[in-house]
Design a protein with these regions (language model features):
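Conserved structural position within tetratricopeptide repeats
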Residues: 119-122, 156
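TPR repeat positional signature
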Residues: 92-95, 131-134, 138
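Residues that mark the junctions of alpha-helical repeat units in TPR/alpha-solenoid scaffolds
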Residues: 88, 126-127
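Boundary/linker segments of alpha-helical solenoid repeat arrays
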Residues: 128-129, 156-170
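TPR/TPR-like (Sel1-like) alpha-helical repeat modules
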Residues: 139-162
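N-terminal alpha-helical interaction modules that lie
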Residues: 21-110, 172-236
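Bacterial Sec-dependent N-terminal signal peptides
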Residues: 1-28
């Protein structure tokens, strides 16, 4: 499955990163570091267009008209929800973990992946890695309509992350989970080889030598807010 997923991730990643680059050239869109205080205020205000319950209903209804700002508030605003824990792993994801390392799967195994990935996402709605596995299994079962819906969601959540910065030291990408750092790297067709926590609550992910010699040796991710909220909730 690793080989299959690697291919899918490269294809999706190229389109996502290319889209982010094209959008950056558009004067209407530039990567902007999020103002978390403003996001918190907006998602808690029932009269705001970004009120979290409104965004969540639109997300679940597969509203294709959701804007980038709405996706930014949906993704980043999840950190202010009661059940948020950046290091929580669903018990359901562990039930199918052994299947992830197989090169191919039987129809019954794909059914198992679909069952537990869906349960895992109900428990942890922004587990992007589970979304990837879920989409893969749906496609293997030729359930293309459902796969397309989840692919759309995944693509826009990844674009929301990419909209928060450039992956540089000066403008790191903001993530709500450390696992999302690796999802972003994989979706760019690269592989993480080393993780370095830096001062200022920033993670630096060194990647394998890219084919493009102009590409950076690694990418930066801002984890300050997730660490702050984790500390407020659990004191560790």
């Amino acid at each position: 499955m690793k080989k299959i997923l690697a291919f899918l991730l490269v294809v999706v990643g190229i389109s996502l990163v290319a889209g982010a680059v094209d959008n950056e050239k558009d004067s209407k869109f530039k990567p902007i570091a999020p103002d978390m205080d403003t996001i918190k205020h907006n998602i808690e205000n029932p009269y705001s267009n970004y009120y979290y319950k409104k965004l969540w209903r639109k997300f679940l209804s597969n509203d294709t008209n959701m804007s980038m700002q709405e996706y930014r508030h949906l993704y980043l605003g999840y950190m202010f929800q009661e059940d948020y824990d950046p290091y929580r792993r669903s018990e359901f994801s562990e039930k199918i973990q052994p299947l992830y390392y197989k090169k191919s799967h039987t129809p019954a195994e794909c059914d198992t992946i679909i069952k537990y990935a869906e349960l895992s996402l109900a428990d942890d709605p922004f587990d992007l890695r589970q979304m990837e596995f879920f989409i893969y299994a749906l496609k293997e079962k030729k359930k293309y309509a459902r796969a397309s819906i989840w692919q759309f969601r995944l693509n826009h959540l990844i674009q929301a992350i990419l909209s928060t910065g450039k992956g540089t030291k000066e403008m790191p990408w903001v993530v709500t989970s450390p696992i999302h750092e690796y999802v972003i790297i994989n979706n760019m067709g690269m592989m993480a080889v080393e993780h370095q926590p830096l001062e200022g609550e920033v993670d630096y992910i060194i990647v394998d030598k890219p084919k493009d010699k102009k590409a950076p040796e690694g990418y930066y991710f801002d984890v300050s807010m997730l660490l702050k909220i984790r500390h407020q909730k659990f004191g560790d």
